[in-house]
Amino acid sequence: VELLIVVAIIGILASIAVPNFMTSVHRAKQKSTMKDIVSISTVITDYVTDNESTPAQDGTYNGSTDFYKALSPFYIKVLPITDKWGNDFRVWTGESANHYGISNPTLNDFLVASFGRDNKQDSFFFRPNDPEGGSFLLTRMSDFNKDLIMWNGSWIRRPGIRSRRGC
C-alpha cells in the first residue's frame, strides 16, 4: 500500500513537472531562434548599407548558396542556417519579399522567418495599421508552432503582450 502511494505521488509530480519542463525547453529554443533572426536581419542590413540592395535570396539557403557567401564570413563569421528546432530559416529579399501580406517590395526589402516548431508556414497576414496584430501570447504548446518573422529588421510576428485597446 505504501509503495502504491509513493508511485502515485511520483506520477502526480511527474505529470506536473514534465509539461513545465517541455514548455521551458521550447521557450528557450524560441528565444534563441529569435536572436538568430535578429542576427540574420542585422547582417542583411549591413550588406544593404554597403551595397545599396539585398543579396538575392528566395527561401531556404545553405553554406554553398550565393546568399550565404555574400554575408559570411565578411559580415558574420557563421550565418545561422537552421532554427533551434532544426528547421531551415527562410529569407526572402528584394522582389521575393512579398510574403505575409507584404506588397510591392523594393530591392532593399527582406523577410527573415522561422516556421516554428512544426516547420509549417502560418497563414499570417501583416497589417501595417495594426503593428501589434502579429504578436501572440504563449498559452499552449501549439503556440510554439507559430512563425517568427522580421521584415526589414522589425518584428511583424512574435510572441509578446498585446496591449488592450482604449486603455
Residue ranges and their predicted role:
Residues I9, K84, S114:
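Short glycine/serine/threonine-biased micro-segments
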Residues T33-M34, D50-S53, Q57, S123-F125:
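Short, solvent-exposed loop/turn and secondary-structure capping segments
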Residues V1-M22:
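N-terminal single-pass transmembrane signal-anchor helix
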Residues S96-C167:
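Short, surface-exposed interaction loops/tails
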Residues N20-V38:
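Aliphatic-rich helix starts adjacent to a transmembrane/signal segment
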Residues T42-T45, T49-Y100:
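Extracellular/periplasmic head regions of type IV pilus-like filament subunits
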